[in-house]
């Protein structure tokens, strides 16, 4: 340890500067940056960070161990992502997603659609505690409905993500909703109640914006006729209401606190079983085998791991009826691993901590302290590329500062959620941004400007802090009582 030196600010920033330059070049030169360009950029930036680490006296073994550790921490997300790919495949061939689109077109008014998409996504996400499951299931169906009535897919994706991350932030079943108060040192329900002060006005503004967009949207240019969509779906699938048993079972097991991996596996297999029962024509279209048992096995496997594209008389509808299974998620898995390598190297040499030191010194007033926390969460979401790191590290960094200023821990936990949780999906190379972009098939840069809830949240929490609205402080003589969290 004695031979190791602390990095200068320039040394700590150098890998990030290299990363920003490479990512900018990729956007200019490559159409599909997720196809490999951004992954290589992250690895090259990690190589630069490794050179800095060696210059500071760190050995390769310590850097390697940190890389392995950070990749290991991302494995649950990677496994969930792969299962979501399989679930999307079996839910397509079973007719679950087409049925959602079919019946949704009858129930949802075009002008109220975006408003409804936010509300529905929020309700499902609060009930399940998972933005990922919400977006991969009801979100995919809502995107199909939105495209069918002629709304730009980026706007629809923004509405879905806004609602889903409301639930991710507010649901007592959500992992981030439990993680933030644990890092800050408060209890879960105090944390949730305190979040309502900033979350409710943020959600209200989000709904108003989407309501205005919906009523100002020009539907005369819609490229898909709703009746044509319904007719094409009806001609390809058996759209029985019984198909809704699949999502009902999935959401039920999630609400019962069955872990995400077995929950998604149950949903995937159930989708395959319903495909065999309800969609024999689809099964035979995919496999071409004479024996139905063989055809069923082939179709289920193909939907779970590979490309499936079903054709209808309407070419526009065909865009809604395709999936890539697990294989479609591999570029995103590659991106997540690359991001974890970069984050691991940066953390191993203390480069991330060095960059945030000036931010901590800047935090004098309550407003500046909250703004510094927000900025740090954004920084870690961008550089470490992981939502959990963006909550855990700032939570540990700033916890003592909040105590010293007499601020109750729920202010810190709320700030971690208002910035760390919701902004992760706005970063293309963050695990959340990369995943939701791949699941919805919409580029992160395209939907980010319309994810109003995620954009407004950090500004709302800073506004409350600077205006001293609902800022909880310890009374004179009151001692902090916080939950100790092991490192």
Language-model-detected regions and their locations in the chain:
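Short, amphipathic, aromatic/basic-enriched membrane-interface segments that mark the entry/exit
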Residues: 3-10, 102-109, 127-131, 230-239, ...
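Hydrophobic transmembrane alpha-helices that form the pore/transport pathway of multi-pass ion
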Residues: 107-197, 201, 374-418, 483-485
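Membrane-embedded alpha-helical segments and adjacent helix-loop junctions characteristic
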Residues: 57-147, 306-399
């Amino acid at each position: 340890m004695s031979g190791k030196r602390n990095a200068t600010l320039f040394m700590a920033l150098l890998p990030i500067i290299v990363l920003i330059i490479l990512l900018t070049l990729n956007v200019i030169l490559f159409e599909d940056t997720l196809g490999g360009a951004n992954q290589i950029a992250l690895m090259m930036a990690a190589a630069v960070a490794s050179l800095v680490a060696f210059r500071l006296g760190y050995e390769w073994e310590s850097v390697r161990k940190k890389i392995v550790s950070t990749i290991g921490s991302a494995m649950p997300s990677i496994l969930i992502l792969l299962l979501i790919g399989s679930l999307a495949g079996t839910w397509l061939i079973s007719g679950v997603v087409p049925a959602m689109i079919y019946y949704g077109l009858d129930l949802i008014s075009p002008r109220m659609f975006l408003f409804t998409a936010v509300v529905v996504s929020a309700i499902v996400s609060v009930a399940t505690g998972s933005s990922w499951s919400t977006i991969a299931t009801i979100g995919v169906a809502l995107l199909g409905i939105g495209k069918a009535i002629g709304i730009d897919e980026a706007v629809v994706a923004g509405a879905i993500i806004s609602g889903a991350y409301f639930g991710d932030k507010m649901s007592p079943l959500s992992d981030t909703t439990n993680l933030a108060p644990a890092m800050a040192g408060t209890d879960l329900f105090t944390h949730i109640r305190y979040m309502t002060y900033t979350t409710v006005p943020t959600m209200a503004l989000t709904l108003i914006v989407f309501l205005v967009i919906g009523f100002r949207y020009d539907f005369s240019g819609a490229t898909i006729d709703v009746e044509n969509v319904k007719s094409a779906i009806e001609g390809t699938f058996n759209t029985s209401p019984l198909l809704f048993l699949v999502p009902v079972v999935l959401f039920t097991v999630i609400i019962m606190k069955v872990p995400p991996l077995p929950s998604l596996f149950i949903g995937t297999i159930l989708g395959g079983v319903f495909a065999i029962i309800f969609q024999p024509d689809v099964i035979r279209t995919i496999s071409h085998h004479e024996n139905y048992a063989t055809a069923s096995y082939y179709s289920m496997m193909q939907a779970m791991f590979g490309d499936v594209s079903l054709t209808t008389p309407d070419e526009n509808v065909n865009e809604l009826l395709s999936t890539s299974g697990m294989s479609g998620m591999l570029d995103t898995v590659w991106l997540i691993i690359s991001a974890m390598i970069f984050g691991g190297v940066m953390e191993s040499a203390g480069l991330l901590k060095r960059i945030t030191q000036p931010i901590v010194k800047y935090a004098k007033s309550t407003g500046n302290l909250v703004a510094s926390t927000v900025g740090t969460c954004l920084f870690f979401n961008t550089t470490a590329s992981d939502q959990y790191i963006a909550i855990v590290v700032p939570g540990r960094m700033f916890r003592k500062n909040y105590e010293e200023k007499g601020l109750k821990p729920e202010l810190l936990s709320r700030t971690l959620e208002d910035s760390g949780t919701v902004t992760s999906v706005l970063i293309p190379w963050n695990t959340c941004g990369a995943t939701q972009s791949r699941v919805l098939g919409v580029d992160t840069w395209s939907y980010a400007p319309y994810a109003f809830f995620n954009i407004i949240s950090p500004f709302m929490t800073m506004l409350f802090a600077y205006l001293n609205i609902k800022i909880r402080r310890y009374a004179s003589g009151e001692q902090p009582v916080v939950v100790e969290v092991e490192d």
